[in-house]
Amino acid sequence: MTHQNLLVELFVEELPPKALKKLGEVFATQLCAQLRQLGLASGDSVSTPFASPRRLAAHITQVAAKAADTAVQQKLMPVSVGLDADGLATPALLKKLQALGADVSDPVFAVAALRKAPDGPSTGLRTGKAEALFYDSLVTGATLDVGLQQALLAALAQLPIPKMMSYQLETDCELPGWSSVHFVRPAHGLLALHGSAVVPVKVLGLTSGKQTQGHRFEAYKSPVQVDHADAYAATLLRDGAVIASFPDRRFAIVQQLAQAAERLGPGFEVLMDEALLDEVTALVERPNVLTCQFEEQFLAVPQECLILTMKANQKYFPLLDTQGKLTNQFLVVSNISPSDASAVIGGNERVVRPRLSDAKFFYDQDRKKTLESRVAGLDKVVYHNKLGTQGERMARVCAIARTLALQLGGEALAKRAELAARLAKTDLLTDMVGEFPELQGIMGGYYARHDGLDADLAEAIEDHYKPRFSGDALPRNPVGVVVALADKLETLVGMFGIGNLPTGDKDPFALRRHALGVIRMLVEKDLALDLNALVAAAVPAFGDKISDASSALCDFVYDRLAGSLREQGYSALEVDAVLALRPQRLGEVPRRLAAVRVFTALAEAPALAAANKRIGNILKKADTTAAVDAHVSELLLQEDAEKALYAAMQDIAPRAQAQLDAGDYAAALQTLAALRAPVDAFFDGVMVNAEALDLRLNRLGLLKTLHLAMNQVADLSRLAA
């Protein structure tokens, strides 16, 4: 059985750049997976994707020319059903064999080819299983030309194509005509090589060969002939001026960008952007980085505006100086490498100039009006048909911000937070944010400084959307933290109140991100705010527009917190134990988790966790018959073990409580670990459910007192195996 490496390439018109990387990866992995299912590729086969603007390809190692034949054993029916009293085939058996493709022209011969075996495994108690008839056959393995045809069609069907194109292709049959083909872009060539041999397959109206096309403008040969599957990438580069590998092409771009910046001098740094790098890599087949520049007058515009327009609209890479300030030079990744690049450079400089002029015009126009003068305009902008206008939203954020600020910093902080919240959304009405919504908040900060507001207020307006994404910085000052918290709470409470909850992977209002933002601020800033009170304080700001979904929202926040903590490396048991208590101060959660980790390392931990779980079960069962109070009468303590436990509690519990009050959770749990011996002795020597009611309730009260003392940091029963 011949094993060779396989290469399949689909040559197409320019593919969508933002989808190219994913298309290439899925094409290769799916093709390899389909070949594995057919037995043509093995578990050791490795797939390598190739993707350029005009091609999708996959190189797969160790592909067989023919899959191995497979022995198939199929149970037909019980012998009593398949054979009559004379041992001849019944009509039911013949029909079954015929359906399987067996030759039933001679029923006696057909029966002789069957195998009798017990129907199921025998056991020591019962060995006399009823016999069944089994049909053994050999399934011929698929040949590569048949298997690849099937695998290729299946792989193309699995591609993540958001929108198909329909195009006409001339048929190659005897009768002239046209047929409709559906694919992401029109396909013009198919290459399929097993080693050096062409595998005859046909998809999308194309028949496979060993020729493809190179660079649209700079190929050294046309067509490009690939003589071996392993020579694909090298041949395309040598004869077609194409770097077929997406990662190799991306690496070449990064290298050229760094070299171009280095040539300009030590003070230049390329503003790299992973998404932009991927998109540009998908736009060129052989990159050539060129240095361009624009007029210095545009540097008077906030650099975020210029950077965004260069990256989003033109796919350029801005250059920064050593202070992180934008320079008037930028880098372009071209798809051609002319001997004289001046025309390409001039064209790019000419194209970017109107974009920068627009940005400067927007900036100049926006500064003619103050943010305060725009506040009234928020009443004309609809935020949500059930939650009113941006003006109403602003009023709610102001009210929530005032409530939070009074708790964190008193009246002085409340006044500044209210002012920042009042102006925070006004940049939505500016021309710049209208053109570039990504700049909301950022432009508000610039315009606030222009209006004469102090740095803290300007930063608060700029930062109130933070954190915008995972790993983003938090607001820089207390005013910003208050307004950012208020803004996110307003969104969460409002959306939950009207029933707009995230479902599956759909979260149009980014409620998960807002919840994580609230969590990060409460935890990392260690704010003295209770979660339930925080949510409850935001509800009245909505009046009768919403229903109170505080409980569901708090559950949602704890759920996001649990996921975040697990991502940080805490175990599910640790997280579950701490969050089972629903701690209100989220800033305490890391300290509680650290304490639990210290506790679980103690020798006493497993026994105490198991005892805690046992106590919880006893109390839960007891509470169904009568309420149990955490009260102990020393006069009713009769057994030595319960007296010893009570005495230990009297000694240890106050010390642990003092440590808890001081916030030293780890020390408190270590102190409580000393209860292991008296707890074990109690369960060994005391009957909790005594017949005398007063004794029983007293012992339950002792256990409840113990349970409350042990579970103030975390629910230790969740740590039990």
Task: Describe each model-derived feature in a short phrase.
Residues 1-721:
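Amphipathic alpha-helical "coupling" segments that flank catalytic cores
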